[in-house]
């Protein structure tokens, strides 16, 4: 469970599965010791079996480059968590006010089929969110300013051994 978001609700929203189908699958996952009895949190074994990919950006106006980058990020793992920059961070990055609020951008990104969960980032420190999500892979867009070395070193400081992958420029 991340920021109060129940994973079962995400599954219901993003799939055409019926409630009884979801319940049956969750029961199977509990029997395999992948999901806890509360039906919403993963066991350590379950957590280790999923490859979580974290991607981030401003996402003020979604364009084909965003879609390409998010599709490439999703292909790297099982769960794609996307972090939308706060309004203040967006101003610092883009040197202008965003057209859409951080909540609107979160809602828009969360509506994309490829995205499993979208969060609003933390002010000033990207590693607060990274520590919270604990991804195995951090996906960077081809045009993002962050350097792989900076991300790798920041992850080490929070005891996270995440791989960093940068997508190629869309042609």
Q: Language-model segments: what does each one mean?
A:
Residues 1-171:
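Nucleotidyltransferase catalytic core that binds NTPs
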């Amino acid at each position: 469970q991340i920021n109060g978001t129940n994973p079962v609700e995400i599954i219901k929203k993003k799939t055409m599965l019926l409630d009884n189908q979801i319940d049956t699958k969750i029961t199977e996952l509990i029997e395999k010791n992948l999901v806890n009895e509360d039906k919403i949190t993963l066991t350590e074994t379950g957590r280790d079996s999923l490859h979580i990919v974290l991607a981030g950006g401003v996402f003020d106006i979604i364009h084909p480059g965003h879609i390409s980058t998010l599709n490439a990020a999703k292909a790297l793992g099982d769960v794609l968590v996307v972090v939308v920059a706060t309004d203040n961070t967006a101003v610092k990055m883009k040197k202008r006010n965003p057209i859409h609020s951080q909540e609107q951008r979160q809602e828009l990104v969360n509506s994309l089929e490829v995205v499993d969960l979208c969060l609003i980032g933390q002010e000033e420190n990207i590693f607060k969110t990274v520590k919270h999500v604990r991804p195995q892979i951090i996906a960077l867009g081809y045009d993002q300013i962050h350097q792989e070395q900076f991300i790798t070193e920041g992850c080490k400081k929070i005891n996270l051994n995440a791989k960093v992958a940068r997508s190629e420029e869309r042609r």
